[in-house]
């Protein structure tokens, strides 16, 4: 086969082991998964009720325009329908962005470490990837990113809060950054975890009308608890949306996914409860870190914590796994002595912290 040359050296995404597989290997009767930043509280009761009574006609193609969901999200953010695009998770939106803007003659600028799919999709298109190391506290080096831009740059990526560190860039700094980026370069503001930020930042979706080169990406996979439904979306100027729709598959979000997302966004009381629970979980880990001088906890603003224990990451990961908790080894994330742990329920956080204390 005459494969694209850009695929040479790349590998496919390898998901972690299934919980059942880990239990069988280690002889455990229970496992708690804290590796994928899923919502430990599940999803809204309204979503659960719809799931129990769903009558989706699976033989019928879904609404390719996601009309009902589009209206719901439009009303929620006070936007226009043409300022939205819906995709099979933010992963698909990232793929579409790289497809329309990157090729072998272009480059893209991003932080490192950050969400791996920016780099992966850029390399698939054959583009040069310019990675700017995070600052020592895990924050984006925005000045360094600006300096990396040249006439061949077409996309700049900002993950906010950043995955895997959890650092959050406030709105004033985002706007100051946008003011300095040339207007013909797209800035992707990936806000997959924005609903977890406490206190919540003021509404800023309409920044897309001031900065025509901005797209804000969000998802129903995290705080809304719909990871398996695969519904993400982008908010941008109509011209950006028009270009993306040219390459968007016609039926890329499912009927059930659209319906579940509608119910999820309606229940903001559940979202607030999740945000409070998550903030309390972060406080548990902050208190733990204060008790041990050698422990470094990165600023947590998502639904996860990145903890550097000064111990080889695989050792920490294996130790927690053997005790029934699946986490994410920092070795694969650019942090060789750290682990990333999803914030769980209060008792789950306490159990993990107790194990870490024993390890130290």
Curated annotation (Swiss-Prot):
One of its GO terms (biological process) is L-histidine biosynthetic process. Gene3D superfamilies: Aspartate Aminotransferase, domain 1, Type I PLP-dependent aspartate aminotransferase-like (Major domain). The keyword Ribonucleoprotein does not apply. GO terms for molecular function: histidinol-phosphate transaminase activity; pyridoxal phosphate binding. It catalyses: L-histidinol phosphate + 2-oxoglutarate = 3-(imidazol-4-yl)-2-oxopropyl phosphate + L-glutamate. Pathway: Amino-acid biosynthesis; L-histidine biosynthesis; L-histidine from 5-phospho-alpha-D-ribose 1-diphosphate: step 7/9. It comes from the Bacteria. Pfam families: Aminotran_1_2. Its cofactor is pyridoxal 5'-phosphate. The keyword Amino-acid biosynthesis applies. Keywords: Amino-acid biosynthesis, Aminotransferase, Histidine biosynthesis, Pyridoxal phosphate, Transferase. Disulfide bonds: none annotated. The modification N6-(pyridoxal phosphate)lysine is found at residue 222. InterPro entries: Aminotransferase_I/II_large, HisP_aminotrans, HistidinolP_aminotransfase, PyrdxlP-dep_Trfase, PyrdxlP-dep_Trfase_major, PyrdxlP-dep_Trfase_small. Its EC number is 2.6.1.9. SUPFAM superfamilies: PLP-dependent transferases (SSF53383). Belongs to the class-II pyridoxal-phosphate-dependent aminotransferase family. Histidinol-phosphate aminotransferase subfamily. Homodimer. This is Histidinol-phosphate aminotransferase. It comes from Listeria monocytogenes serovar 1/2a (strain ATCC BAA-679 / EGD-e).
């Amino acid at each position: 086969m005459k494969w694209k040359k850009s695929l040479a050296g790349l590998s496919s995404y390898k998901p972690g082991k299934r919980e059942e597989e880990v239990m069988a290997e280690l002889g455990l009767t229970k496992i708690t998964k804290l590796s994928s930043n899923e919502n430990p509280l599940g999803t809204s009761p309204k979503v659960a009720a719809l799931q129990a009574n769903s009558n989706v006609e699976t033989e019928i193609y879904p609404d390719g325009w996601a009309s009902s969901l589009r209206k719901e999200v439009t009303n929620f953010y006070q936007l226009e329908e043409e300022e939205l695009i819906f995709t099979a998770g933010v992963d698909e939106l990232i793929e579409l962005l790289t497809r329309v803007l990157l090729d072998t003659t272009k480059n893209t600028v991003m932080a490192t470490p950050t969400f791996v799919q920016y780099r992966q999709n850029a390399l698939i298109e054959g583009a040069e990837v310019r990675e700017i190391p995070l600052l020592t506290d895990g924050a984006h080096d925005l000045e360094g990113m600006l300096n990396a831009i040249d006439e061949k740059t077409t996309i700049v990526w900002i993950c906010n809060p950043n995955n895997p560190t959890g650092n959050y860039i406030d709105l004033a700094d985002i706007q100051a950054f946008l003011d300095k980026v040339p207007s013909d370069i797209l800035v992707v503001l990936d806000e997959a975890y924005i609903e977890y930020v406490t206190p919540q930042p003021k509404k800023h979706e309409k920044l897309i009308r001031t900065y025509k080169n901005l797209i804000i990406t969000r998802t129903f996979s995290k705080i809304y608890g719909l990871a398996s439904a695969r519904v993400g979306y982008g908010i941008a100027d109509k011209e950006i949306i028009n270009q993306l729709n040219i390459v968007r598959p016609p039926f890329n979000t499912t009927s059930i996914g659209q319906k579940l997302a509608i119910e999820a966004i309606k229940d903001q009381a559940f979202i607030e409860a999740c945000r409070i629970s998550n903030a309390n979980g972060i406080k548990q880990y902050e208190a733990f870190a204060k008790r041990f001088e050698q422990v470094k906890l990165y600023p947590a603003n998502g639904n996860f914590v990145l903890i550097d224990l000064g111990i080889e990451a695989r050792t920490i990961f294996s130790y927690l796994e053997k005790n029934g908790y699946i986490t994410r080894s920092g070795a694969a994330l650019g942090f060789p002595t750290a682990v990333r742990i999803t914030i769980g329920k209060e008792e789950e956080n306490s159990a993990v912290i107790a194990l870490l204390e024993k390890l130290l």
